[in-house]
Amino acid sequence: MKLRKLSALLLTLCCAVMLGSCKVTETATTTTAVPSKNTIQPAVLIQEESNLLELLDVQQPMLFDFSVEGASIYWVEIFTLQDGAWQPSGGSTSPIDEPDLRGRIALTFGEDGRFAGIAFQDEDGVSRISQDPETSAFVSHASTSAADPIEIVLDEPIALWAYYGEQEAAASTTAYFPDHALQNPQEIQSDFAQLITITFAAAG
């Protein structure tokens, strides 16, 4: 329960700082530049945002900024690996009312590195999903995330983050990057794996 409450608090803070952080001004040192059109990329917190997170003494969330044209809806999906294939285990959908949309996604994690919650903000508002902590724990774990700007292609999922957990201390983990994990789930040998994607879709 403590993790859930902490995740909710952190996501609320992320939503607050996201409302004004996706704009470009002449003062480059105190603002976050938006990505190029039809691009999603890792975001960098400005100093004021970092200071707010330090007050909470919690792990910094993983942030992605995006800018897209021609999409009518986007959705974030959470997948869990089962029998060599990705199976949906959660997510959220948001309609797009503007021809050009800018927004930010924030992912938060528990002490063991596992996914705890997600918030996403666009020009229409903010929404969030929180996940109860799992009862099972892993002796070792690893995670990877998208590190470079990625071109947004409508109707094609973009993998943002992948997690791998092992139940045995001696087990070796091959931590594939999210894009490889999305396309090749059959190669993953970990005891547990989770993936988060975002998809932007056109009308019709």
Residue ranges and their predicted role:
Residues 23-25:
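Bacterial signal peptide processing site
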Residues 27-204:
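Mature, Sec-exported extracytoplasmic domains of Gram-positive
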